[in-house]
Amino acid sequence: VSRQRVWGVPLPIFVHKTTKEILVDDMVNENIASIYEKEGSDCWFSDDPQRFLGNKYKAEDYDKINDIVEVWFDSGCTHAFVLEKREDLQWPASMYLEGSDQHRGWFHSSLLESCGTRGRAPYESILSHGFVVDGKGLKMSKSVGNVMAPEDILKKYGADILRIWVASSNYEEDLRIDY
């Protein structure tokens, strides 16, 4: 569930230098949570470890771990942070809507996290759509030179043509475009 990166949501873990035991202390965890609520979690990477430990422990006795939460695990938890925290939304979601690349990404990580913590999926259904690809069916890429900016199409043909094309297309398949 972790990665070694310099960006992302940090895992607030201290390991005792001598015993190699992970520090488990509710007061320290509450202090870290309080700081995160006010300032965000990026302070973990820059602030003095003593600030998080408080007066009960000495920073020189602990290694501060700088691993981050694995990004798919992080995104898989969003249902809890969004749907369960907002009164105008309901949990589980009616539908998760994303591209087919998310079968092994967001759909999968959300399903695993939610089933593990709540015993069911965080959504009632999922809807997968295809992607807009070039006229040959290839993924658009700046390095290949086959990218078509929607603004260019709008300038040449107008918004209504683009809307009609999208609305009349089968969302389950990749949409080929060439002009």
Model-predicted regions and their roles:
Residues 1-179:
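Structured secondary-structure scaffolds
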